Amino acid sequence: MPTGTVARAWVLVLALWGAVAGGQNITARIGEPLMLSCKGAPKKPTQKLEWKLNTGRTEAWKVLSPQGDPWDSVARILPNGSLLLPAIGIVDEGTFRCRATNRLGKEVKSNYRVRVYQIPGKPEIVNPASELTANVPNKVGTCVSEGSYPAGTLSWHLDGKPLIPDGKGTVVKEETRRHPETGLFTLRSELTVTPAQGGTTPTYSCSFSLGLPRRRPLNTAPIQPRVREPLPPEGIQLLVEPEGGTVAPGGTVTLTCAISAQPPPQIHWIKDGTPLPLAPSPVLLLPEVGHEDEGIYSCVATHPSHGPQESPPVNIRVTETGDEGQAAGSVDGSGLGTLALALGILGGLGIAALLIGAILWRKRQPRLEERKAPESQEDEEERAELNQSEEAEMPENGAGGP
């Protein structure tokens, strides 16, 4: 065994002996050598001693003797009776016992409870916030520590003082994971706060503590996000597709609640005055719409600093294809229908008048022919008389000539 390794082991033993003298608890850093002394062991061979250990490497008590065995690479007994662990690990945590018989035949026992530790790297705040909004919850950042054993704890500080989570204005979400191969821990702590209006610029930091005596916490670099006043929300609008809210059975209706506010408010939906049991979302999708989906819909935007705000309602109706066309142009359709009805009535009256006129004309036609026949005969008689008078005058005119 190299001299340097033995020297470091003895230094560790001397450093820990003060803690062991009063009690039998020892803490050792992972990967470092550890030496445990056996009280009462004879300084000269042959000594009578026995080491027993119950650790993560054993299912029960393991007995070691000075003669050595295959466990020499893990733990072996030195000539002076001490037990050396060249590189202690997590699996070496447990109980170690030594029983020795001195020259006077008196039996002396030594008991040790060994714990190991590993100091992680310096913690850091990932995804730190550069700006916070007053009166609303804000995520400050996530404090991360990697490679610790045991797990340890993460703590947040505000302006140098411990920040105690209260579940309201200060919320901390913690997560602890253990590496399946090394057994070391990774800790994550997410801080969410609700800063007040008009306050000073806060300073946040995070620290890691292993929970061992004489071990100082490891601190992150501080962050100073500025606090701004929340923007009041603008008017809320409810958009519906298809436009007008009228859809055929089996169609799809999409309702979108539009509001401009920072941070974005939570959107809840109401139908016929009753809140719908849905998760907050700015979009409400109604697929395969049926008559049971008909009703008055509206959305409510809840902003932490400004209270709830409800949108104008929208009426969703389910109609057949023909009814849908009629409903889509209800004003124009009714006017055109009235005009068509009036034209139809007038056209019918005109046709009826023509038919009556034709019938009456046909009835009067024979009478007119009867009246015309006598008039023609009288004309012929008058014409004959005129011809005769003209013929009588012609001879008279001839007889009176020179």
Curated annotation (Swiss-Prot):
Factors inducing expression: Up-regulated in periinfarct ventricular myocardium.
PTM sites of type Phosphoserine: 376, 389
Keyword Transmembrane: yes
Every Ig-like C2-type domain range: 123-219, 233-315
Keyword Nucleotide-binding in annotation: no
Segments passing through the bilayer: 342-362
Keyword entries, A-Z: Cell membrane, Cell projection, Disulfide bond, DNA damage, DNA repair, DNA replication, DNA-binding, Endosome, Glycoprotein, Immunoglobulin domain, Inflammatory response, Membrane, Nucleus, Phagocytosis, Phosphoprotein, Receptor, Repeat, RNA-binding, Signal, Transmembrane, Transmembrane helix, Ubl conjugation
Residues in compartment: Extracellular: 23-341
Gene3D superfamilies, per the entry: Immunoglobulins
PTM summary: Phosphorylated on its cytoplasmic domain by PKCzeta/PRKCZ upon ligand binding. Phosphorylated by ATM following DNA damage. Targeted by the ubiquitin E3 ligase subunit FBXO10 to mediate its ubiquitination and degradation.
GO biological process: astrocyte activation; astrocyte development; cell surface receptor signaling pathway via JAK-STAT; cellular response to amyloid-beta; cellular response to fatty acid; cellular response to glucose stimulus; cellular response to hydrogen peroxide; cellular response to xenobiotic stimulus
Disulfides per UniProt: 38-98, 143-206
Cell compartment(s), UniProt: Cell membrane; Cell projection, Phagocytic cup; Early endosome; Nucleus
Pfam families in the cross-refs: C2-set_2, Ig_2
Signal peptide (residue range): 1-22
Domain Ig-like V-type per the UniProt entry, residue ranges: 23-109
Region (Disordered) residue spans: 368-402
Reported tissue expression: Endothelial cells and cardiomyocytes. Expressed in brain.
Assembly description: Constitutive homodimer; disulfide-linked. Forms homooligomers. Interacts with S100A1 and APP. Interacts with S100B, S100A12 and S100A14. Interacts with TIRAP. Interacts with HMGB1. Interacts with LGP2; this interaction plays an important role in AGER-mediated pro-inflammatory responses and cytokine release. Interacts with double-strand break repair protein MRE11 which is a core component of the MRN complex; the interaction enhances MRE11 endonuclease activity and promotes DNA repair.
Function: Cell surface pattern recognition receptor that senses endogenous stress signals with a broad ligand repertoire including advanced glycation end products, S100 proteins, high-mobility group box 1 protein/HMGB1, amyloid beta/APP oligomers, nucleic acids, histones, phospholipids and glycosaminoglycans. Advanced glycosylation end products are nonenzymatically glycosylated proteins which accumulate in vascular tissue in aging and at an accelerated rate in diabetes.
Name of this protein: Advanced glycosylation end product-specific receptor
Species of provenance: Rattus norvegicus (Rat)
